[in-house]
């Protein structure tokens, strides 16, 4: 049942999108490809950006344990599977030089792995940024110094950047909690952040990314659950980037 909820969200978003029929058909073929072959996606970012919450939202169930408070939950790369969709949840960077060095080596090792056919194991890397943070230096270093140099051929088409916690981008201000969406001031702020991230990544790597923003939703320390926002857009973003062949 959970598999259907993911695919239905993707298909509904494609069918309702204001895109040409040719492009719509291409996206539908990508969904079929996702169903037919195993797709490995690495999810990475700085500590506290919401990687585990994003995985839980995508799977529509609590498969990844979310850290509460100051301690990050993910300390090693963890694998989560839902049929042909395989997500690799990496430890967050930014918790100290020694830990970062260890995590970086593990990320590089995973990026270097190949499948039984000799192709790169990791098909896509999704870098998640914390929309509520002004300091994104750790994430930019991760992209420019770890992922780009170690991701092999076609990397310019296989790196996705998504800004999580859109609801907290202005410290919770200008978010309509009843309708679970940003008002126009926050939309403008988020759009400016998208352009800023795009510029920073291009300056550092020469690669053009097209960031999106969303909110995975999360459970706080008291078990209160907030609703996801723009999750279907995140799924659509991933489907759009699926390689045409392994």
Indicate residue ranges for each PLM-predicted region:
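Conserved G1/Walker A P-loop phosphate-binding module
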Residues: 1-95
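Flexible beta-alpha connector loops of hexameric P-loop NTPases
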Residues: 92-101, 182-187
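Short glycine-rich substrate-engagement loop in P-loop NTPases that contacts/grips substrate
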Residues: 70, 97-107
């Amino acid at each position: 049942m959970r598999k259907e909820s993911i695919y239905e969200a993707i298909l509904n978003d494609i069918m309702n999108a204001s895109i040409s029929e040719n492009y719509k058909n291409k996206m539908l073929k990508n969904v079929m490809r996702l169903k037919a072959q195993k797709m490995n996606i690495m999810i990475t970012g700085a500590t506290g950006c919401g990687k585990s919450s994003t995985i839980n939202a995508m799977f529509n169930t609590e498969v990844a344990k979310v850290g509460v408070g100051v301690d990050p939950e993910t300390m090693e790369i963890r694998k989560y599977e839902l049929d042909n969709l395989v997500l690799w949840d990496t430890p967050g960077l930014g918790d100290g030089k020694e830990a970062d060095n260890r995590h970086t080596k593990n990320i590089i090792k995973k990026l270097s792995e190949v499948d039984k056919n000799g192709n790169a194991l990791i098909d896509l890397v999704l870098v998640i940024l914390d929309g509520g943070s002004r300091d994104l230096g750790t994430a930019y270093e991760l992209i420019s110094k770890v992922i780009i140099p170690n991701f092999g051929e076609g990397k310019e088409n296989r790196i996705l950047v998504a800004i999580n916690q859109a609801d907290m981008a202005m410290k919770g201000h200008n978010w309509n909690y009843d309708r679970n969406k940003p008002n126009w001031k926050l939309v403008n702020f988020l759009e400016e952040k998208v352009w800023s991230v795009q510029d920073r990544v291009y300056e550092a790597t020469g690669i053009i990314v097209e960031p999106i923003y969303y909110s995975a939703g999360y459970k706080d320390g008291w078990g209160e659950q907030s609703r996801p926002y723009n999750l279907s857009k995140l799924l659509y973003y991933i489907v759009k980037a699926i390689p045409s062949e392994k």
